[in-house]
A protein has these predicted regions:
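Primarily the dimerization/phosphotransfer
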Residues: 34-73
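Conserved catalytic submotifs in the C-terminal HATPase_c
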Residues: 81, 115-120, 137, 142-152, ...
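Short alpha-helical segment of the dimerization/phosphotransfer core of two-component systems
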Residues: 89-94
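Helix-loop junction within the histidine kinase core
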Residues: 105-116
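Short helix-loop "hinge" at the ATP-lid/N-box region of the Bergerat-fold HATPase_c
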Residues: 172-173
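Short conserved segment of the HATPase_c
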Residues: 213, 227-239
Length: 300
C-alpha cells in the first residue's frame, strides 16, 4: 500500500504537491517570525531597562547643576556660568533623548495607557512655554503664546499633550535659525470628519458642519527653512531624519512619538510648510475622547 501511496503522490500535478508541502513551509516561517519577535522584545526591553536606569542619576546630576547655577553654594564668574549653562543644556538633551526612547518602547509594546481628566488647555500650554522659555532665549529665539479665552476645560491627557508640544518645540528650536520666532496657538475647531455621518446628504453635511466645535486645534509655527513637499508625510515615520540633517541631535523619534500619542487620544497631526517660509505643525484633539483608540499603528 505504501508503494501505491507513493505512486499516487508522484503522479499528482506539481501544483498539488506544492500545496501539500506549503503548511510545513508556512509553519517554519511562523516559528522564525515568532523567534525574531521574541528577540526584538527582549532587546527592546533590555535597552529600555538600561535607559530607565540612567534616568535617576541624570536627574540628580541636572539637579546639582541647577543648584550651582543658582549660586546658592557660592558665586560664579562669567566663565563658570557659561560652562554650567553648557552642562545643563547637554544634560537636558540627554534627558529628552532617554525619555523619547522610553516612550517609544512603551508605544511599541502597546502598553501605553491614556488618562483623560478635565484640564485647561491654556494652562497646559503655558506650563510648556515656561519650561522651554530659557532654552529658546539661550538659542536666540523668540517664543510666543497667547491664551485663548474661547477654550473651555475638557477631558484630555495633559502630560501626554505637553509631551507632544515639547517635541514640536524641540523640533522648531533645532531648525529655526538664531533670531527666528516660534508661535504656539490653540483654538476651538470643528472637526467635520468626527461629527458628520457618511450617510448624510450634501445638504445635511453643510448644516452639520455649522455645529459647535468638537475639537481643539493646537499649532506650532516657526520661521525655519521649511520642509520639502515630498518629506511632509515621511517626517512622522520612526527614526526618520531629513536629508542633510543626519548630524542633528536626536534619534528621529520626536515627531513619530507625537503622532502615536495623538492617535492614542483619537487625534491627528499634520504639517504645512514651504521652503524658506517656515513650517506650521498642527494637531487636533477631540473634545470627547475615544477611549479605545490604539496608540500603535502607522496610518491616520
Amino acid at each position: 500500500m505504501s508503494t501505491g501511496a507513493s505512486s499516487m503522490k508522484e503522479n499528482l500535478p506539481s501544483k498539488s504537491r506544492a500545496q501539500m508541502s506549503e503548511p510545513a513551509f508556512s509553519n517554519e516561517n511562523v516559528r522564525e517570525l515568532e523567534s525574531l519577535r521574541d528577540r526584538y522584545r527582549k532587546t527592546t526591553n533590555a535597552l529600555a531597562s538600561a535607559a530607565h536606569d540612567l534616568k535617576t542619576p541624570l536627574s540628580i546630576l541636572n539637579g546639582y547643576i541647577e543648584l550651582l547655577q543658582s549660586q546658592k553654594l557660592g558665586p560664579l564668574n562669567d566663565r563658570q556660568r557659561e560652562v554650567m549653562a553648557d552642562m545643563f543644556s547637554s544634560g537636558q538633551r540627554l534627558q529628552h533623548f532617554i525619555q523619547d526612547f522610553l516612550t517609544y518602547t512603551v508605544l511599541e509594546t502597546g502598553e501605553l495607557r491614556m488618562q483623560f481628566v478635565e484640564n485647561d488647555m491654556n494652562v497646559c500650554l503655558s506650563e510648556v512655554c515656561r519650561i522651554w522659555s530659557n532654552r529658546f532665549q539661550e538659542r536666540g529665539l523668540a517664543l510666543y503664546f497667547l491664551a485663548n479665552d474661547k477654550l473651555t476645560p475638557f477631558p484630555f491627557d495633559a502630560p501626554k499633550v505637553q509631551r507632544v508640544i515639547s517635541n514640536l518645540l524641540e523640533n522648531a528650536s533645532k531648525y529655526t535659525p538664531q533670531g527666528g520666532t516660534v508661535w504656539l496657538h490653540a483654538e476651538p475647531h470643528m472637526w467635520e470628519r468626527r461629527s458628520v455621518s457618511k450617510s448624510a446628504s450634501n445638504g445635511d453635511r453643510r448644516r452639520q458642519s455649522n455645529n459647535a466645535p468638537n475639537a481643539v486645534k493646537v499649532s506650532v509655527s516657526d520661521t525655519g527653512p521649511g520642509i520639502r513637499p515630498e518629506f511632509q508625510l515621511e517626517i512622522f515615520d520612526d527614526f526618520f531624519r531629513l536629508p542633510g540633517n543626519e548630524a542633528t541631535d536626536g534619534m528621529g523619534l520626536g515627531l513619530a512619538i507625537a503622532r502615536r500619542l495623538l492617535m492614542g487620544m483619537g487625534g491627528k497631526i499634520w504639517v504645512e510648510s514651504e521652503l524658506e517660509a517656515g513650517s506650521k505643525f498642527s494637531f487636533l484633539i477631540p473634545l470627547n475622547p475615544i477611549l479605545n483608540s490604539p496608540p500603535r499603528g502607522t496610518s491616520q
